[in-house]
């Protein structure tokens, strides 16, 4: 039984791949189908297309979990040389949570994770950092994800500075 079916599109770029062979590791991220097809059509029409023109058609990877790519230089370097790194960051914002019977509190709301980041592992890592007193200002962590989308609520203490806590989350956890 075949494990890979042939296709007229580059499945390796479409689905991405990760592996190690003969001491070399590779990690190819998934890409957007429409962008890949546009790049292929341009390459078929003009086999002498420049790297810059191709990069404009296929601007970067398309990660299924969302997240933000920080900077375009890492993508460009990877596409041109075959080596490079792409820094990913989850999407998080600061909101004020109103609860009846208690004062309003700020919270960090995480709505998207970087590619291949485990949600349960992230929550566990945040809890460990809070318990070890390496991450200050957090009073509660809740996973409010449902079928409408992912939502992790990191409730802050009243004396905490929300932007400082958010920066520490990026620095100390797999959120970046």
Regions found by a protein language model. Give the residues of each.
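Intrinsically disordered, low-complexity regulatory segments
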Residues: 1-15, 20-176
